[in-house]
């Protein structure tokens, strides 16, 4: 949906605590007569200045080609939004994902008519503006409803960007169908899962998912079958089935209501039938899609979603199948959902998580017990080795004592003797012993030291020259014998049987 320029707020909600002036806004510009002016030449300004001298700032709004150009466009809603629980939530604000889809636009319109504020997530803000302008022009939406409509750009890309687009909404609705991402594009189960994950990030309290079962029906067209086959073959990931979607939604922390149905147009005969809500797997639900009588018009499913958001307690964590029946009476939403049991997938998942956590804790405890047992066993081995070493040391000491006793010497005695030797040994005593030994080894001096009295008497004697007596030489002193030269020795031997004699003479070189 889109709005007129005066009633379609496309900017983000103002921060809390900001006060607004309720008086009519007026544009006041203080400028001199020589200030710049728009759209006029200097000559024209001079000619008109005489007539309108009090209004120097001229601007002709009638020459604007389209008032739509004055509407601010939010190209990046993430810059003005804070996702998560940091922003104060509004219990009366609902985020409609795919608000320009065939069912999404009817859901947004019905919610506005019921008094809710709507944040419309759209893939194209320009198209949403056109729709809002048409709705306001033809009175499809009242001025009050248009004021409560806030469109934000929100393609199905990632959960973080969708969470920022959700903003202060406390409830979220998304429709899975072939014409729900705009008027002719598909919203898949994977896209719906992204919306649920974004709702969990944004702190949303309740999510409603409308699943149109006609998207999986056969068109009996060969080209469509070939296109679907090759599309699934070359796709990066296979699309989620509705069962997989419910399983993953049950694993989140957001309360949910999943509606399985087969949608039809509002001008079909089913618009006069009443809605029937049955439990999942019932034959009276949308499973009998072959019968045209059981389909649900889009306006009726939008009315059911609005009733659910008005009383979410009766529809929390339930998966239902919705159809129409001409013979069914009209019932309020609390009667329709009170007989539906709560979906058991979340409880099964919670039990599985608790069981897995208990098994993990038991495994950790078993590992710790095993490690403690191994540590105790290793400690016992170390203690056993230590006791064996102590016994071996004791036996060696006993053998040494026995050997010492055998030779008559005890170990204590040896230690005592060693102590005595070490105590009696000193460097001073050892030095004096060496000095005494050296003095005893020296010869006794020939000159005797006189007594004190003798020394005094010797000092008084006059000095005399010492006379040395020389021994007279004897004339008969024997002369040293001169050595006679040795005669050369001869050696004679007989040769040739005594016929000849050979004489060998040895002469000294001296």
From Swiss-Prot:
GO process terms (BP): circadian rhythm
Modification type Phosphoserine: residues: 395
Species the sequence originates in: Arabidopsis thaliana
Its biological purpose: Probably involved in the regulation of plastid gene expression.
Topological category with respect to the lipid bilayer: Peripheral membrane protein
Location of region: Disordered: 1-24, 38-58, 453-493
Membrane-spanning parts: none
InterPro entries hit by this protein: NAD(P)-bd_dom, NAD(P)-bd_dom_sf
Family affiliation: Belongs to the NAD(P)-dependent epimerase/dehydratase family.
Protein name, as recorded: Protein PLASTID TRANSCRIPTIONALLY ACTIVE 16, chloroplastic
Post-translational modification: Excluded from chloroplast nucleoid when phosphorylated on Thr-451 by STN7 that may regulate membrane-anchoring functions of the nucleoid.
Amino acid composition bias (Basic and acidic residues), ranges on this chain: 41-51, 479-493
Residues reported to bind NADP(+): 94-123
Gene3D superfamilies for this protein: NAD(P)-binding Rossmann-like Domain
Reported phenotype of the disruption mutant: No visible phenotype and normal nucleoids.
Secretion signal span: none
Gene Ontology cellular-component terms listed: chloroplast; chloroplast envelope; chloroplast nucleoid; chloroplast thylakoid; chloroplast thylakoid membrane; cytosol; stromal side of plastid thylakoid membrane
Polar residues bias locations: 1-14
Gene expressing this chain: PTAC16
Coiled-coil blocks: 354-403
Transit pept. (range): 1-19
Coiled coil listed as a keyword: yes
A Pfam short name: NAD_binding_10
Subcellular location: Plastid, Chloroplast stroma, Chloroplast nucleoid; Plastid, Chloroplast thylakoid membrane
Residues with the Phosphothreonine modification: 451
Known partners and oligomeric status: Component of the plastid transcriptionally active chromosome required for plastid gene expression. Interacts with DEGP1 under high light conditions and maybe its degradation target.
């Amino acid at each position: 949906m889109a709005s007129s320029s005066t009633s379609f707020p496309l900017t983000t909600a103002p921060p809390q605590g900001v006060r607004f002036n309720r008086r009519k806004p007026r544009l006041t510009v203080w400028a001199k007569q020589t200030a710049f002016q728009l759209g006029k030449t200097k000559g024209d300004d001079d000619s008109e200045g005489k007539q309108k001298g009090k209004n120097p700032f001229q601007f002709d709004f009638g020459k604007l080609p389209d008032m739509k150009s004055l509407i601010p466009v939010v190209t990046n809603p993430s810059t003005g939004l804070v996702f998560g629980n940091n922003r104060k939530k509004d219990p009366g604000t609902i985020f409609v994902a795919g608000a320009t889809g065939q069912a999404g636009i009817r859901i947004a319109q019905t919610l506005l008519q019921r008094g809710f504020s709507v944040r419309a997530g759209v893939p194209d803000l320009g198209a949403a503006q056109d729709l809002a302008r048409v709705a306001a022009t033809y009175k499809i939406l009242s001025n009050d409803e248009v004021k409560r409509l806030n469109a934000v750009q929100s393609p199905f890309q990632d959960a973080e960007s969708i969470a920022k687009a959700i903003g202060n909404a406390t409830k979220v609705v998304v429709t899975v169908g072939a014409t729900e991402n705009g008027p002719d594009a598909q919203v898949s189960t994977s896209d719906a899962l992204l919306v649920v994950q974004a709702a969990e990030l944004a702190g949303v309290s309740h999510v409603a998912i409308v699943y149109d079962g006609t998207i999986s029906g056969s068109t009996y067209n060969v080209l469509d079958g070939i296109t679907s086959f090759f599309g699934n073959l070359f796709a990066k990931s296979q699309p989620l089935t509705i069962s997989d979607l419910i399983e993953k939604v049950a694993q989140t922390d957001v309360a949910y209501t999943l509606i399985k149905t087969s949608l039809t147009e509002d001008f079909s005969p089913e618009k006069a039938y009443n809605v029937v809500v049955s439990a999942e797997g019932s034959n009276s639900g949308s499973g009998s899609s072959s019968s045209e009588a059981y389909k649900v018009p889009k306006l009726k499913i939008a009315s059911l979603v609005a009733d659910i958001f008005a009383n979410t307690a009766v529809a929390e964590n339930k998966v239902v199948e919705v159809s129409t029946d001409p013979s069914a009476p009209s019932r309020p939403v609390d009667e329709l959902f009170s007989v539906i049991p709560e979906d058991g997938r979340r409880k099964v998942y919670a039990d599985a998580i608790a069981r897995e956590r208990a098994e993990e804790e038991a495994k950790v405890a078993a590992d710790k017990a095993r490690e403690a047992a191994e540590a105790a066993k290793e400690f016992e081995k170390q203690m056993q080795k230590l006791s064996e070493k102590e016994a071996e040391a004791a036996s060696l000491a006993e053998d040494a004592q026995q050997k010492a006793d055998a030779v008559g010497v005890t170990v204590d005695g040896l230690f005592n003797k060693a102590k005595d030797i070490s105590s009696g040994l000193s460097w001073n005593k050892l030095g004096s012993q060496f000095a005494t030994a050296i003095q005893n080894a020296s010869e006794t001096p020939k000159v005797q030291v006189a007594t004190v009295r003798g020394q005094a008497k010797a000092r008084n004697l006059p000095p005399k020259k010492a006379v040395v007596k020389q021994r007279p030489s004897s004339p008969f002193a024997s002369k040293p014998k001169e050595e006679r030269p040795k005669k050369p020795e001869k050696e004679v031997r007989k040769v040739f049987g005594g016929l000849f004699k050979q004489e060998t003479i040895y002469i000294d070189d001296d």
